[in-house]
A protein has these predicted regions:
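Aromatic- and charge-enriched surface segment that lines or borders ligand/interaction sites
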Residues: 84-128, 150, 237
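Surface-exposed binding/hinge segments that line
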Residues: 97, 131-175
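Gly/Pro-rich hinge or "lid" segments in bacterial periplasmic/extracellular proteins
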Residues: 71-76, 164-218, 222-224, 230-232, ...
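C-terminal segment of N-terminal export signals and the immediately downstream linker at the start
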Residues: 16-39
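Alpha-to-beta junction loops
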Residues: 34, 115, 147-149, 239-248
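N-terminal lobe/hinge region of extracytoplasmic solute-binding protein
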Residues: 37-90, 120, 188
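N-terminal export signals
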Residues: 1-20
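Extracellular/periplasmic solute-recognition and catalytic clefts
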Residues: 140-142, 196-207, 224-275
């Protein structure tokens, strides 16, 4: 369980800070921002092949997409970069069609080559990805054509679609150009928010990606996560209205925040920030 507090609409962050409300990107988000107090430091980079820190992992839920993703509040799977439900060809073969019109934040289209590359770099032992353990049932990944990818499994696996959520699709052309270290520091994805900047012990800044055509577009134009590991600092920021929402509310501060007309909720966290 996790306690979080917010003021009015600032608490409407079911999921990870409010992107998970299905509606089209619209002009009415212009000028809307979210400032939130986060309890975890920036402990790793953002490359989804290697990122394991709580804050960058949560940030990646906005920056990147998998073929299938899990809604962070309900944990229900939904089609992200997959345009159709995964098609089972036989007991150990699955095919997935890519979502039409998906683009990365640099404007380049998301391709099947990017999908194959994203899985292969995680499966490559040389990369020592933590996430390979979640897809160790996959034998190979290959392109069928420019819209479809095929997965061959080592054995039948009932949770195939759910495990796809562990792999986020990255732009091969960007990593080839700038290298893994630069990509780790300044990620480029296809999700509803673009990465703007990150400063250790300060904040992570995002902005809405207007061309995003997936299920859950951004509902605000800009989002800033203030990295406030100290609980007293988070509470002070919330009370002073520097932030609209905070997570991990200290138990001893609950009554005081409620007396100041703050909404405080206790929710199942699933180990995520702002569940």
């Amino acid at each position: 369980m996790k306690l979080m507090a917010g003021v009015g609409a600032g608490l409407a962050f079911s999921g990870t800070l409010g992107t998970f409300a299905p509606k089209a990107f619209a002009a009415d988000i212009k000028g809307k921002t979210i400032e939130a107090g986060i309890a975890y430091p920036l402990s790793t980079g953002f490359d989804p092949m290697t990122s394991s820190g709580a804050s960058p992992y949560a940030a990646n839920l906005h920056i990147f997409e998998g073929l299938v993703d899990l809604h962070p509040a309900t944990r229900e799977p939904y089609l992200a970069l997959a345009g159709k439900e995964p098609e089972q060809v036989d007991e150990t073969t699955w095919r997935i069609t890519l979502r039409e019109g998906a683009t990365f934040h640099d404007g380049a289209p998301v391709t099947i080559e990017d999908v194959v590359y994203s899985f292969n770099r995680i499966m490559d032992p040389a990369n020592k990805s933590l996430f390979v353990m979640f897809i160790d049932f996959v034998e190979s990944v290959k392109a069928v054509d420019d819209k479809m990818v095929e997965f061959k499994l080592k054995y039948p696996f009932a949770l195939f679609a759910n495990r796809l959520t562990c792999v986020k699709i990255v732009p091969k052309h960007v990593i080839d150009k700038v290298g893994q270290s630069a990509f780790d520091a300044h990620p480029v994805g296809s999700g509803p928010f673009k990465f703007v900047s990150a400063v250790k012990d300060d904040k992570i800044v995002f902005e809405a990606y207007e061309p995003y055509n997936g299920k859950y577009p951004a509902q605000v134009e800009k989002m800033s996560w203030l990295l406030l590991s100290d609980a007293a600092a988070r509470v002070t920021a919330q009370e002073s209205k520097r932030t609209q929402a905070m997570e991990s509310v200290p138990y001893l501060d609950i009554s005081r925040l409620k007396n100041k007309k703050q909404q405080v909720q206790s929710v199942q966290s699933f180990g995520l920030l702002f569940p």
